[in-house]
Amino acid sequence: MTAVNDFLTPRSIAVNAINQTHAKVVLEPLERGFGHTLGTALRRILISSMPGCAITEVEIDGVQHEYSSIEGVQEDVINILLNLKGVALKMEDSEETTLELVKKGPGVVTANDIQRDHSVEIVNPDHLICTITGDTELRVKLKVQKGRGYVAADSRQSEDDETRGIGRLQLDASYSPVRRVAYVVEAARVEQRTDLDKLVIDLETDGTIEPEEAIRRAATILQQQIAVFVDLEQDAKPEPKQEREEIDPILLRPVDDLELTVRSANCLKAENIYYIGDLVQRTEVELLKTPNLGKKSLTEIKDVLASKGLSLGMRLENWPPVSLRDDDRLNAKLR
């Protein structure tokens, strides 16, 4: 006879793969009611809380706003942006990167035409972006960021909005790699008990993650969130004290102290580079992607840094330091 406090747990978990991005996950048996309890929780996490990558900003040569059209390109800018939102990406080494797309027509432009390095993978390279009908060269700069769930462009307002150049188009970001998820609860039976549940989760992803792994991550998130209820009297663990950081004082000085030309200084501030420590972590390639910053300005920056024993491409641990508060950055921006 089963004790009152003994709950059945699933004896089998079956993953029925329909294809690489679509699968049905079956859990049984569950106590009556637990099918809907777990199904609802997992479905909400899969839809709203899964991390992933998305294109969040687009800059097209010759285009100032999304209501434009491009001569020699079949699609208007709005349709191009919608197609770019459908590009499925994986990014391993960083939280943010910038990619470029350069294509000369006539011909079809696909996700495979996006130039990328080893840290970025496009899992749907045949995805259509646009069609060039004339002898036009399309040049596009794409910002890719990691995030979670769905984030509207308006909610990503930041301090650099006032300095953002015309033509940098913001996209609503759907970071979640889960495209569709649904569940049903069916009847299950164990020996003489016929009042049990069987949970069937129907899951489809964009290809950047396998359905089985998506379920596993969602279950891990759920487990971490409810673990605190196991022992409500448990004291919160004190946060470890951070050791005092040893940082060269010159890195904490604003870039204005480098006495660069007005053009170079403004270009750096437009990219949220307010301190010398921010600057030395950038590479030459990254700086050359900065609007209005050319090779002459880059040479000037390198020479000034070299005179102080610094260089571009340096790696700084624990930057920015705790002592560099947000209000300090705001003050630097207002200088």
Swiss-Prot record:
Belongs to the RNA polymerase alpha chain family. The gene is rpoA. Pfam families: RNA_pol_A_bac (PF01000), RNA_pol_A_CTD (PF03118), RNA_pol_L (PF01193). It is an enzyme of class 2 (transferase). Residues 1-233 are annotated as: Alpha N-terminal domain (alpha-NTD). Homodimer. The RNAP catalytic core consists of 2 alpha, 1 beta, 1 beta' and 1 omega subunit. When a sigma factor is associated with the core the holoenzyme is formed, which can initiate transcription. The N-terminal domain is essential for RNAP assembly and basal transcription, whereas the C-terminal domain is involved in interaction with transcriptional regulators and with upstream promoter elements. GO terms for cellular component: cytoplasm; DNA-directed RNA polymerase complex. Keywords: DNA-directed RNA polymerase, Nucleotidyltransferase, Transcription, Transferase. GO terms for biological process: DNA-templated transcription. Residues 247-335 are annotated as: Alpha C-terminal domain (alpha-CTD). InterPro entries: DNA-dir_RNA_pol_insert, DNA-dir_RNA_pol_RpoA/D/Rpb3, DNA-dir_RpoA, RBP11-like, RNAP_asu_C, RNApol_insert_sf. DNA-dependent RNA polymerase catalyzes the transcription of DNA into RNA using the four ribonucleoside triphosphates as substrates. This is DNA-directed RNA polymerase subunit alpha. The keyword Transferase applies. It comes from the Bacteria. GO terms for molecular function: DNA binding; DNA-directed RNA polymerase activity; protein dimerization activity. It catalyses: RNA(n) + a ribonucleoside 5'-triphosphate = RNA(n+1) + diphosphate. Its EC number is 2.7.7.6.
